[in-house]
Design a protein with these regions (language model features):
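Conserved substrate/cofactor phosphate-moiety recognition/catalytic segment
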Residues: 89-132, 234
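A glycine- and Lys/Arg-enriched "phosphate-lid" helix/loop adjacent to the NTP-binding pocket
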Residues: 47, 159-228, 242, 252
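Hydrophobic positions on the alpha1 helix immediately C-terminal to the Walker A/P-loop
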Residues: 83, 87
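The conserved Walker
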Residues: 76
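Conserved nucleotide-sensing/catalytic segment adjacent to the nucleotide-binding pocket
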Residues: 111-160
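Conserved lysine of the Walker
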Residues: 80
Length: 263
């Protein structure tokens, strides 16, 4: 402000104890606004200690700093996309779709076999943009359909080598909770998937686990083949992640309602 010739006349604050310091250090008078918190019973300290409880008081630009991220991983036809959509609905929040599928349709005419090594950095960058968008507008938690480890695993599977740009995003984007789905659900051919044999599915699952470990990424392995059991287990895991903050904000009967099929 000094460089631009701006001289403030007043400082507006709710902290009465700070007024003498502003006067002494800056020579500026302080105008106190609601110092007794009678109109707005909240403080910055309260928000920092318990951001989810006071979520509505946090500016939109600041909320992404507090958002928790949950990545759902798994091989082809493991139910990731459907599960992510259900979780986003039940927690009333955003999700990042799998950009790789969109890329194949928009750039390769829907032919996954046309993928080349040079495509994987573009896929990873698109996925990062999807993640950033989901986090920006999330309601406390954002769900991610497929992470960068999965993109790297497909690159290694199809191209025989890893991509350095994808690895850079693996290192940069560390999610708060990573859930790995066992690839033991019924295979559904959708025109894009090519790893449908039992051998291929198991091989890719092993590759995912190996790459998670090599990148020092902790994950929770959900092994049930039952879709409902998977869903309920993931709800539990997310509730544990958000812990007491979520319990104060969400309905206490969230899980019980899910079990009863009300959500």
């Amino acid at each position: 402000m000094n460089e631009k010739g701006i001289v403030p006349n007043f400082i507006y604050s709710s902290e009465s104890q700070d007024a003498p310091h502003y006067r002494e250090q800056f020579g500026i008078e302080t105008i106190l606004i609601d110092p007794e918190r009678s109109f707005m019973n909240i403080s910055g300290r309260q928000i920092r200690r318990d951001p989810f409880r006071y979520w509505d008081y946090i500016p939109t630009e600041v909320k992404p700093f507090f958002v928790r991220t949950v990545a759902i991983l798994g091989g082809e036809s493991s139910g990731k996309s459907t599960l992510v959509n259900k979780l986003a609905n039940i927690f009333n929040t955003t999700s990042a779709w799998e950009y790789g599928r969109d890329y194949v349709f928009s750039h390769l005419g829907g032919d996954e076999m046309a993928l080349q090594y040079s495509d994987y950095d573009k896929i990873a960058l698109g996925q990062a943009q999807y993640v950033d968008f989901a986090v920006k507008y999330a309601n406390k938690v954002a769900f991610i359909d497929t992470d960068f480890v999965t993109t790297q695993a497909f690159c290694k599977k199809y191209e025989g080598r890893e991509h350095p740009f994808v690895q850079a995003l693996i290192d940069e984007y560390r999610f708060d909770l990573v859930i790995l789905l066992e690839n033991n659900t019924p295979w559904v051919a959708d025109g894009l998937r090519s790893l449908g044999s039992e051998r291929d599915r198991k091989s890719f699952q092993n590759l995912l686990e190996q790459m998670l470990r090599s990148n020092n990424i902790e994950y929770v392995h959900v092994e049930s083949a039952d879709y409902d059991e998977r869903f309920l287990r993931c709800v539990e895991l997310v509730q544990q992640l958000l812990a007491a903050d979520l319990q104060r904000l969400a309905r206490p009967s969230l899980l019980s309602e899910a079990r009863e099929g009300q959500l």
